[in-house]
Amino acid sequence: MDPALLTPMMQHYVELKRQYPHAILLYRLGDFYEMFFQDAQLVSRELELVLTGREAGAIGRVPMCGIPYHAFDRYAAQLVAKGYALAVCDQMEPADQAKGLVRREVTRVITPGTVIEEELLQARQNNYLAAIVRLRGSKQTVWGLAYADISTGEFWVCQGEGQEQLEQELARLQPAEILLPTEEGLGLGLMRPGDPQAPLGLPGQYTYTLRPAEPFELATARENLLQTYGLRSLEGLGCEGLPLAIRAAGGLLHYLEETQKNLVQPSPQGGHPLLRPPRTYQLTDYLILDTQTRRNLELTQTIREGAFVGSLLWVLDRSRTAMGGRTLRRWLLQPLRDPEQIRLRQDTIQELLESPSLRTRLGSLLDSLYDLERLANRVASGTANPRELVALGSSLGKLPQLAELVAEAQTPLLQSLQQVDPALVDLGHRIEHTLLPSPPPVLTEGGLIRPGVDAELDRLRQQVEQDRHWIAQLEKTERERTGIPTLKVGFNKAFGYYLSISRAKAQQVPKEYIRKQTLTNEERFITPELKEKEARILTAQTEINQREYELFVQLRQEAGSQAAAIRQVAQTLAAVDALFGLAEVAVQQGYTRPVITADRRLIIEEGRHPVVEKSLPQGLFVPNSVRLGSPHGPDLIVLTGPNMSGKSTYLRQIGLIQILAQMGSFVPARRAELGLCDRVFTRIGAVDDLATGQSTFMVEMNETANILNHAGERSLVLLDEIGRGTATFDGLSIAWAVAEYLATQVRARTIFATHYHELNQLETLLPNVANFQVVVKELRDRIIFLHQVQPGGADRSYGIEVGRMAGLPQPVIERAKQVLALVEQHSRIGLGLRSQGKSRPSSNNPKKRFKQESNSRGIPDCDAKAGDQLSLIPTSLYPEEL
């Protein structure tokens, strides 16, 4: 397009659009942000707005779409949520003061990962911007990851190996945007979720931004980090020997510098104005929960509806602040492996439990706090509005009360609140003494500053008040002087102040009145003196608004200079709030403190599923116990029982209790002793993956393979109905082999729920396997689910009885019984492998032992041979002492 064919304003628009080709350009024209050309068509379609046109010069009309500036946040939130980037071009001078074309500049670029506006964020979830650098070798991908939330100041870096680990970290973080250097093989630009051109080997559900490679180069990235944080070495950050993590962090910082020009100004105190120095972590520092485990255990949302209600977080989150809620969510998705850190959290919960009065008063104070984490970055970026600054002042003003409340605290976290930074208290008082308690949200309309703060402001206000009083008295004096009882003083934005007189009295108007407007029932007049007073009021009001704005900006800058200290206090308060919430849950639900051990034990007495228990009337949930991990119990439990008996609930509650314990929480059990886990694996239910063309069984096998390849003896494995997605004998064979491998090779603590009752035979073959069942009570015409887990293996699944309960027609039920009888009669595997006893055999040779028992029970030779084949486990797999 030839710029010469465009109007000057359109030429400027096109020039800016070329600078930001991958963003929607919102161009401020008066009271609207306008979009043109393809951007207009896109926004019109996405937001269902009217598409109009505008004369652009010699090329004629071009597509145009606009949004009111006062509704910017609402529309911007929708576009950002859809994965778009926005370049916001604002007017830098009033239109009536411009000499020629109004000066406009792009003040910021809003991308999914660089949002700081409250309206565009979820209060209790982080909004992460991530950067990845990968080196794909012949063996394994080595990667560096940096991620930050510029609304809270968090900044983390990590380096690892293996594509699977990287994808699991991304799944935990759910970043709003991921930055990649162009060395990944793609051109520059933004790729929205679902884009078929997604970077090779990375999940397609994220927004990717492809960036120039230079800021990600090691020397450039390293220098950026050193200069930004005023360092001579990166050793203090813990990432000196992690080159890929350094590269990712440097690329992330450069992106913020480029897109947030007006927000990322050098801090007077040094460091980055929005991000604290990056913290380095290792994946092995935390309990690893893969995507399937987080989904199957419904940690943050339910499987069916994807809802928050019904998740574990729904039960746990009793925090009083948004920052406490975000902290709790992070802890839940990243449980600890450091027993000392776990103990510190437990100690704080214990102290709060043992002091109900402290807990009550602390809850009230936390209730009065605002989101200090995000408020700190709002003032640091210079974007906090008057109400947000009032909220900051109010929250800082509570710090002395918090310090007094925890004066006798015994735990380190609560004790840290005893030391209050006087500068923050002074700042809080200054804000409260400067700003009115309920200021308007718009910064330029006045009504911000309290009387007595500024002498010049007080003088101007007094002048306006006197002039308005004169105008108010004018109505009375003019009525008396003219003898017109209907005379009134009015005001509107178009004409200013005027004298209103009914048409019937128009003949009595004094000669000095100047007619301004004639309406159906009235005449409107002005006088020179009235206009003089009006001019004085308007001039003074403009000066008042400008002075209030200046005072507010000064105060906001003062608060911004304390942003780092505010973030530090906010981090402590968020942790206290999260633990306060866990203490509240422990009291309300009767949770107990688990004992964390260094061995492999997993002992839970009368454990309960926290979500199911919460959803049932009090006292109706049936608790169950478990002992796992030799020598305290078996390494693998084969769990059998009918459909609907509660096997899946039992599996999930064990996993949830382990996770709760390692995040530092108390647990729903009468007693628990738990050895630290490195990973929790689950395979509970499966569905077709149509997107990749995988059947239910293939999905199941992929998940099972992942467990067998990555689990170790410090892992917890929870498996439900392995092998059910294929033919019966194939499924049984796979289930047998998987259970056998877990018990003999992996030695992970495992619960293996199954309807293949033949697996009960493993108890007689392997000394570290035990059978347990969920029992039912049989009546003449129905069964009652007792939901009790007891030693021993079940020999029936009661599937037909469950079908009757579900409403299957009676002829179907009767025919099913006939077929079942035939199948059981002719199934050699069923006859050959069904366990007839619970005692452990004395023979040390499992193959010989099975043969002897088969013959002694009179099992036909063919069946014994089939059983012998299934039990051909190499003797080397059986340690003498398990």
Curated annotation (Swiss-Prot):
Annotated Polar residues bias: 836-845
Binding positions (ATP): G641, P642, N643, M644, S645, G646, K647, S648
A cellular component annotation (GO) from this entry: cytosol
Gene Ontology molecular function: any one: mismatched DNA binding
Superkingdom of origin organism: Bacteria
Gene3D superfamilies (alphabetical): 1.10.1420.10, DNA repair protein MutS, domain I, MutS, connector domain, P-loop containing nucleotide triphosphate hydrolases
Residue ranges, annotated region (Disordered): 833-867
One BP annotation, GO: mismatch repair
Keyword annotations of the record: ATP-binding, DNA damage, DNA repair, DNA-binding, Nucleotide-binding
PANTHER family membership: DNA MISMATCH REPAIR PROTEIN MSH1, MITOCHONDRIAL, DNA MISMATCH REPAIR PROTEIN MUTS FAMILY MEMBER
Function as written in the Swiss-Prot or TrEMBL entry: This protein is involved in the repair of mismatches in DNA. It is possible that it carries out the mismatch recognition step. This protein has a weak ATPase activity.
Similarity section: Belongs to the DNA mismatch repair MutS family.
Protein name: DNA mismatch repair protein MutS
Organism: Synechococcus sp. (strain JA-3-3Ab)
Upper lineage: Bacteria, Bacillati, Cyanobacteriota, Cyanophyceae, Synechococcales
